């Protein structure tokens, strides 16, 4: 079956049939994986993955999203079976929680806050900072004994900063073999370091992304919390499956996929969509009244 045939494939309805596919089209649609960016912001290299343009916005071909997701799953599972280690990277607001959660679930290292330059290319500097982190934690346990209150406050601030930036990588003993990136535009520095160290890169590609930055890309919305949660969790499922663990989303059917509750409503260009205020027109006397729909007859 080629990609065009997949576009016209019938919807799967039975629970058992859904478990034969990595994820249903319905869940891809529900997660908003198909929303791209404004057409004016696109990267021409993403043209093969764009289905259409609607109201000035590119629509991603979810048939290709699902096909790429399945391939990436098998690729990651194969690496994991061979004992590869992974690093999850996602420093944008929408990706932080799922990146951290799935990295911890798979016993992988992760960066969900600021990427520290040299994380992969200057291990000596990073290890020195990790040692400083450990020393400050010991000082905190002692109540900063022997130091003034002012010095204790300064130590606490430095400790909080180091914990925020280093917690996900403090146990890194060697370089990972595979990097999973939530947004290739936001975390270009991480990608460049991975390229220098010949680390395989698997990333989500929105319509404004450069697919040449990764070894394998998954065309999908990288701004939606639901989209990121769905894709990152499925990729993590591949690592878990290689170790005979329980999968959460991949090949589990629609009923198993529950998206996180969030008040954030992220638009296709990374901006929160704010509800439109109802239109009102001003009366001559200065009061306001709602505008009636012209198609509705007024009740007399």
Curated annotation (Swiss-Prot):
Classification via CDD domains: RPS2 (cd01425)
Region (Disordered): 261-300
Keyword RNA-binding set for record: no
Keyword terms of this UniProt record: Ribonucleoprotein, Ribosomal protein
Annotated GO MF terms: structural constituent of ribosome
Biased segments, Basic and acidic residues type: 282-300
Any GO BP: translation
Gene3D superfamilies found in the cross-reference section: Glucose-6-phosphate isomerase like protein, domain 1 (3.40.50.10490), Helix hairpin bin (1.10.287.610)
Domain of life: Bacteria
Gene Ontology cellular component terms for the protein in this record: cytosolic small ribosomal subunit
SUPFAM superfamilies: Ribosomal protein S2 (SSF52313)
Alphabetized InterPro entries for the sequence: Ribosomal_uS2 (IPR001865), Ribosomal_uS2_bac/mit/plastid (IPR005706), Ribosomal_uS2_flav_dom_sf (IPR023591)
Family assignment from sequence similarity: Belongs to the universal ribosomal protein uS2 family.
Protein name per its UniProtKB record: Small ribosomal subunit protein uS2
Organism field: Mycoplasma mobile (strain ATCC 43663 / 163K / NCTC 11711) (Mesomycoplasma mobile)
Gene designation: rpsB
């Amino acid at each position: 079956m080629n990609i065009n045939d997949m576009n016209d494939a019938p919807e799967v309805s039975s629970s058992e049939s859904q478990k034969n596919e990595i994820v249903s089209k319905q869940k891809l649609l529900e997660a908003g994986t198909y929303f791209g960016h404004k057409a004016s912001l696109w990267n021409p290299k993403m043209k093969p993955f764009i289905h259409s343009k609607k109201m000035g916005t590119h629509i991603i071909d979810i048939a290709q999203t699902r096909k790429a997701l399945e391939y990436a799953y098998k690729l990651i599972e194969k690496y994991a079976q061979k004992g590869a280690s992974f690093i999850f990277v996602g420093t944008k607001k929408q990706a932080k929680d799922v990146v951290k959660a799935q990295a911890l679930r798979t016993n992988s290292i992760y960066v969900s806050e600021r990427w520290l330059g040299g994380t992969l290319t200057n291990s000596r500097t990073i290890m020195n900072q990790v040692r400083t982190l450990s020393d400050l934690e010991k000082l905190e346990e002692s109540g900063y004994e022997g130091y003034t209150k002012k010095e204790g406050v300064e130590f606490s601030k430095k400790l909080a900063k180091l914990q925020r930036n280093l917690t996900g990588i403090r146990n890194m003993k060697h370089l990972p073999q595979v990097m999973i990136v939530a947004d290739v535009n936001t975390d270009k520095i991480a990608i460049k370091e991975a390229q220098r160290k010949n680390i395989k890169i698997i990333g989500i590609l929105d319509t404004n992304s450069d697919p040449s930055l990764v070894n394998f890309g998954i065309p999908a919305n990288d701004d939606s919390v639901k989209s990121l949660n769905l894709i990152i969790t499925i990729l993590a499922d591949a690592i878990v499956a290689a170790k005979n663990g329980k999968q959460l989303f991949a090949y589990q059917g629609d009923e198993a996929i529950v998206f996180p509750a969030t008040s954030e409503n992220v638009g296709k260009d990374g901006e929160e969509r704010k509800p439109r205020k109802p239109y009102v027109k001003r009366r001559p006397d200065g009061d306001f009244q709602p505008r009636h729909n012209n198609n509705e007859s007024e009740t007399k």
